[in-house]
Amino acid sequence: MTTLFQLSVFALIILSFLLVIGVPVVLASPDGWSTRKNTVFSGASLWIGLVFLVGILNSFIS
């Protein structure tokens, strides 16, 4: 259970880093938002899911 928690936290950190770098690049590029809108929304949805997963797993670890 601890390993699953650690992997989910690691995935959350990596995804957060990718979104912090990627979203401004997509918004700054010409015609980037209209072509990459689904990718940004998918990344944001995955991030929200990981936040809830980390919270749920944390309740089992603590």
UniProtKB/Swiss-Prot annotation:
Keywords: Chloroplast, Membrane, Photosynthesis, Photosystem II, Plastid, Reaction center, Thylakoid, Transmembrane, Transmembrane helix
Coiled-coil residue windows: none
Classification via Gene3D superfamilies: Photosystem II PsbZ, reaction centre
Membrane topology: Multi-pass membrane protein
Protein's UniProt keywords contain Cytoplasm: no
Major subcellular location class: plastid
Transmembrane segments: 8-28, 41-61
Places the protein is found: Plastid, Chloroplast thylakoid membrane
GO biological process: photosynthesis; photosystem II stabilization
One GO term describing the cellular component: photosystem II reaction center
Function according to Swiss-Prot or TrEMBL: May control the interaction of photosystem II (PSII) cores with the light-harvesting antenna, regulates electron flow through the 2 photosystem reaction centers. PSII is a light-driven water plastoquinone oxidoreductase, using light energy to abstract electrons from H(2)O, generating a proton gradient subsequently used for ATP formation.
Subunit structure: PSII is composed of 1 copy each of membrane proteins PsbA, PsbB, PsbC, PsbD, PsbE, PsbF, PsbH, PsbI, PsbJ, PsbK, PsbL, PsbM, PsbT, PsbY, PsbZ, Psb30/Ycf12, at least 3 peripheral proteins of the oxygen-evolving complex and a large number of cofactors. It forms dimeric complexes.
Similarity remark: Belongs to the PsbZ family.
PANTHER family: PHOTOSYSTEM II REACTION CENTER PROTEIN Z
Protein name, per record: Photosystem II reaction center protein Z
Source species of the chain: Staurastrum punctulatum
Name of the encoding gene: psbZ
